[in-house]
């Protein structure tokens, strides 16, 4: 199991489009992935769950990934956050 903290750095936070990219990315992996912040923990493969986090810019998200492809999944998720969901120029 891997755990890591990621910071939402894109201007609009985890809005619908960013959430869809996150869920689509994590759905490619077999590992179970949870995201937590502000006392809420959700399945990263659930668009409604991720939207419920209401994560704005600057929010720290704790990521927990468990499964055979956890390292690859964590790298993909980290890159998505680092690239600001390919939204900010």
Swiss-Prot record:
Activity regulation summary: Phosphorylation on Ser-46 inhibits the phosphoryl transfer from enzyme I to HPr.
SUPFAM superfamilies xrefs: HPr-like
Domain HPr: 1-88
UniProt-annotated location(s): Cytoplasm
Protein origin, superkingdom: Bacteria
One CC-aspect GO term: cytoplasm
Active site positions, chain numbering: 15
InterPro entries with a match to the protein in the record: HPr (IPR050399), HPr-like (IPR000032), HPr-like_sf (IPR035895), PTS_HPr_His_P_site (IPR001020), PTS_HPr_Ser_P_site (IPR002114)
Example GO BP: phosphoenolpyruvate-dependent sugar phosphotransferase system
Phosphoserine PTM positions: 46
UniProt entry keywords in alphabetical sequence: Cytoplasm, Phosphoprotein, Phosphotransferase system, Sugar transport, Transport
CDD domains the record matches: PTS-HPr_like
Location (main, coarse): cytoplasm
Function: General (non sugar-specific) component of the phosphoenolpyruvate-dependent sugar phosphotransferase system (sugar PTS). This major carbohydrate active-transport system catalyzes the phosphorylation of incoming sugar substrates concomitantly with their translocation across the cell membrane. The phosphoryl group from phosphoenolpyruvate (PEP) is transferred to the phosphoryl carrier protein HPr by enzyme I. Phospho-HPr then transfers it to the PTS EIIA domain.
Membership in a protein family: Belongs to the HPr family.
The protein's name: Phosphocarrier protein HPr
Taxonomic source organism: Xylella fastidiosa (strain 9a5c)
